[in-house]
A protein has these predicted regions:
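Glycine-/small-residue-enriched transmembrane alpha-helix faces in small-molecule transporters
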Residues: 1-40, 77, 150-179, 198-200, ...
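Juxtamembrane helix-entry segments on the extracytoplasmic side of multipass membrane proteins
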Residues: 6-10, 34-39, 43, 64-70, ...
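Transmembrane alpha-helices of multi-pass small-molecule transport proteins
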Residues: 28, 33-82, 107-114, 165-173, ...
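Hydrophobic/aromatic residues within transmembrane alpha-helices
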Residues: 31, 41, 90, 116-119, ...
């Protein structure tokens, strides 16, 4: 009973984390309207998160070996700089719908990666894979919302797929790291290497908006939200959930992202909740339940 209650709590934390991430598009859009680029927003939010994490977690600066330190750098790239840059840049070449469909399919690829890396047959049950596929179909229904209009763009779709694979690899790397290091230490390193590896971007596109921009309440407030809550706390809770639930269970929660985005858009922007959304949401929830019930070998 205690284990079951713990699993419910871990899932609630994962859902809440994904729900918060599903609302960040509003904050990002506000900041972009105030003159900040996606790369600048990423740099600032991760810098804020790193400074805050360093204040609470500073006794240990480096991993036990250079191999582990290299793994931390990969986490910072796949879960930070490369993920955010490829996702945001994809929308300059293709539609938001295409980008959302490809990026939100990362749980399916994470499941397949676990199957490839951990080859024993108990790792991924066929019913679990079917549950993940059902959730994937539900995600497609929610994102399309009854409008089957896709625009193929090789460059944009390739960038979106890069972001998708980045998050899947990030989740897989996190699984192999959480047994040796605390979620707080790993999260701090993710922020550090995320900021470090985005710096070459400024060689080609230097500069930040004038200081006056950052004194605006909407800019200051949204940067604090993205840095403190959406980055520091959410990455910390996400990494903790992966350590408790495992890669497949935790990453399947990403399918829930379009649901929270649509609900928030309905509340803030007045967008309509359609029968397609309800059907897709039902598929996502049922698929996640089936996949979770059959996740026996992966913990």
């Amino acid at each position: 009973m205690q284990t079951k209650n713990n699993n419910i709590f871990y899932h609630l934390v994962a859902f809440l984390t994904v729900a918060i991430w599903g609302t960040t598009f509003v904050s990002t859009k506000v900041l972009m309207l105030n003159g900040l680029s996606p790369a600048q927003i990423f740099t600032l939010r991760f810098s804020i998160a790193y400074v805050l994490m360093l204040a609470f977690n500073h006794r240990r600066l480096f991993a036990d070996s250079w191999q582990d330190e290299a793994k931390m750098a990969l986490l910072g790239i796949t879960g930070g700089s490369l993920y955010f840059c490829s996702e945001n840049e994809a929308m300059n070449f293709t539609t938001t719908t295409n980008t959302s469909l490809i990026v939100c399919s990362c749980p399916l690829f994470a499941t397949l990666l676990v199957r490839l890396v951990y080859k024993d047959s108990n790792r991924i049950h066929i019913v679990q894979l079917l549950g993940s596929l059902l959730a994937f179909v539900g995600m497609i229904i929610v994102v399309l919302n009854g409008r089957f209009v896709l625009h193929l763009s090789p460059v944009g779709d390739a960038l979106a797929f890069t972001a998708c694979m980045c998050w899947a690899i990030y989740s897989l790397l996190m699984k192999s790291t959480t047994g040796d290091y605390s979620p707080a230490f790993i999260t701090r390193k993710v922020f550090f290497y995320g900021v470090l590896t985005i710096l070459p971007y400024y060689i080609f596109i230097p500069g930040f908006p004038p200081l006056e921009v950052f004194t605006r309440p909407q800019v200051f407030g949204n940067l604090l939200f993205l840095g403190c809550l959406a980055s520091m706390i959410c990455f910390l809770t996400w990494n903790w959930c992966i350590s408790k639930l495992g890669t497949v269970k935790a990453t399947n929660c990403v399918y829930f992202n379009p649901i929270t985005t649509m609900i928030f858009a309905s509340w803030v922007l007045g967008e309509q909740i359609t029968p397609y959304f309800l059907a897709g949401a039902a598929c996502i929830l049922i698929g996640m339940y089936v996949a979770d019930k059959k996740t026996r070998g992966e913990s």
